[in-house]
Amino acid sequence: MEKNSSVDSLDISLLARPFRNPNYKAQPRRNRNLRQIIQNDPVQNEPSKFSYSSIEAPPSVLPQPKYCDVTGLLAIYTDPKTRLRYHNKEIYGLIRELPSGADQEYLKLRSSDVVLK
C-alpha cells in the first residue's frame, strides 16, 4: 500500500484545480459556410473599403521580385552584358558559356528581348 499512496501523491490529475470554474459550460460553436460569411460582410455596401472578399486591392508598395532566368530562383544579380538575371556564380558561369543568340531566347521568355530592325 505504501507504493500506491506514493504514486497517488505524485499524480497531478488528482490535484484540485482552483483556477478552473467547475460550473463553466463551453458555448457550442457554430460553423458558417462562405456564402453566409459574404452575406454578413458589412463592407459590401461600401465599395471603397477593402475586405477579405473583395478582389480589388491597391498596388503593392513592395518591389516586384526578380527571378533567375535559368533556374527560377530569386535573382540577386544581373549580367551587365546579356542583361540576364542569375542566382549565384554557378549560373553566371553557365550564362557566360551560352552560345550567341541563346541569351536573347532567355530574354524573350521574360518578354524583355530587344528586336533589332
Swiss-Prot record:
Gene field: ies6
Pfam families from the UniProt entry: YL1_C
Origin species: Schizosaccharomyces pombe (strain 972 / ATCC 24843) (Fission yeast)
Key word Transcription present: yes
Record-given protein name: Chromatin-remodeling complex subunit ies6
Function: Probably involved in transcription regulation via its interaction with the INO80 complex, a chromatin remodeling complex. Also involved in the regulation of telomere length.
Main location: nucleus
Biological process (GO), any one: DNA repair-dependent chromatin remodeling
Family classification: Belongs to the IES6 family.
Gene Ontology cellular component annotations, sorted alphabetically: chromatin; cytoplasm; Ino80 complex
Transmembrane spans: none
Location within or outside the cell: Nucleus
Self-association state and partner proteins as the record states: Component of the chromatin-remodeling INO80 complex.
Superkingdom, natural source: Eukaryota
Record keywords, A-Z: Nucleus, Transcription, Transcription regulation
